[in-house]
């Protein structure tokens, strides 16, 4: 924790010097692309965006009658640009109940350097494996893991590697990636390969991927993942199919199917979820059913930096029964806070 405070102190001083001395000169032309939309931006902001995300609350496991107040996680985010073409992104778990080891780089979800030119990008560093699932793609503190699949809880997604992106049209991304294999068990010369497509239209969004995860020399586990999100006014519906295996039986022996409808309004969101799963994982070789429902509320009119939530779930593999999660998530933008402080001096 002392290292964190030292780091934040240095970061604050660096931001302060940049804000006070170079605020006007910190803008320059940029060709910028996101995962789904390669588009031109007129300016680039060299001041890093530093923020903290936190979530905590009360959880009640009804199967074991075990209830307690707890903190779900404290995350540090740093994003910025080194030049008009080079950007970086950093997300680190200062504390988290979702992972057993948060020390050193084990506590880093991603640490990437990206070079963008035209409709192409190259990214190197630690990143999430491309996997076509909106359940998997959600941020840790935006996900209620007690209503998620067994695969979500057991897949070691954060890996070192390199990836490339091609953005042929607005809202379209073709992504390729090579990383260390999540099935390597710590051994070298075992790699994972991913080819993904993300598309976005007014009424539909896709995230599909084909994956190979090497577990021995010349031996791979294959995976096909089809994430689909439909937009119907204020309603969204996620429909996902994921399958894994080493032979043609993968489509019936190891798979996950999920449906998640949601309704969103100005100051809140309500959602439900239903999933069926069959897995050949060594620790849990069985079928699983998981269901849940919840609501999120945003008490601030000007932004969504504070979120209240209540979520119920039933997950046979996770708790063997019902679970209730009540809590709050909040975001503190340290860069904006320092800018406002300096503007008053």
Give the label of every model feature segment.
Residues 24, 47, 55-65, 100-101, ...:
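Outer-membrane beta-barrel pore domains
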Residues 1-4:
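Positively charged n-region of N-terminal signal peptides that target proteins for export
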Residues 15, 87-88, 93-94, 155-156, ...:
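A structural preference for long, well-packed, hydrophobic secondary-structure segments
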Residues 105, 181-185, 292-294:
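Short, electropositive alpha-helical surface patch
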Residues 23-27, 51-63, 99-101, 121-198, ...:
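Surface-exposed coil loops of outer-membrane beta-barrel proteins
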Residues 8-16:
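Bacterial N-terminal signal peptides
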Residues 53, 70-74, 106-110, 157-161, ...:
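Transmembrane beta-barrel architecture of outer-membrane proteins
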Residues 20-122, 164-172, 309-313, 322-345:
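Beta-barrel outer-membrane channel/assembly domains of diderm bacteria
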């Amino acid at each position: 924790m002392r290292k964190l405070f030292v780091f934040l102190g240095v970061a604050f001083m660096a931001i302060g010097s940049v804000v006070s001395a170079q605020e006007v000169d910190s803008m320059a032309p940029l060709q910028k692309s996101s995962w789904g939309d390669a588009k031109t931006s007129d300016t680039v902001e060299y001041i890093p965006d530093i923020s903290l995300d936190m979530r905590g609350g009360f959880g009640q496991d009804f199967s074991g009658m075990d209830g307690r107040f707890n903190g779900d996680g404290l995350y540090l985010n740093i994003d910025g640009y080194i030049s008009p073409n080079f950007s970086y992104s950093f997300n680190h778990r200062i504390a988290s109940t979702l992972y057993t080891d948060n020390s050193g780089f084990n506590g880093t979800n991603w640490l990437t350097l990206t070079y963008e030119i035209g409709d192409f990008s190259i990214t190197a560093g630690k990143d999430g494996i491309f996997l076509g699932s909106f359940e998997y793609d959600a941020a840790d503190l935006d996900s209620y893991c007690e209503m998620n699949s067994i695969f979500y809880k057991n897949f070691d997604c954060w890996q070192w590697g390199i990836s490339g992106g091609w953005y042929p049209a607005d809202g379209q991304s073709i992504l390729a990636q090579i990383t260390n294999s999540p099935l390597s068990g710590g051994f070298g010369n075992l790699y994972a390969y991913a080819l993904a497509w993300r598309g976005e239209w007014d009424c539909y969004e896709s995230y599909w991927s084909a994956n190979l995860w090497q577990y021995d020399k010349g031996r791979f586990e294959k995976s096909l993942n089809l994430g689909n999100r439909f937009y119907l006014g204020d309603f969204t519906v996620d429909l996902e199919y994921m399958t894994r295996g080493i032979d043609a039986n993968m489509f019936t022996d190891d798979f996950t199917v999920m449906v998640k409808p949601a309704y969103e309004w100005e100051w809140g969101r309500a959602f439900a979820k239903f999933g069926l799963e069959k897995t050949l994982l060594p620790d849990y070789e069985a079928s699983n059913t998981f269901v849940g429902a919840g609501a999120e509320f945003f008490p601030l009119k000007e932004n969504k930096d504070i979120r209240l939530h209540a979520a119920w779930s039933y997950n046979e593999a996770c708790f063997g029964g019902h679970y209730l999660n009540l809590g709050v998530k909040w975001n503190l933008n340290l860069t904006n806070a320092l800018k406002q402080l300096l503007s008053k001096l």
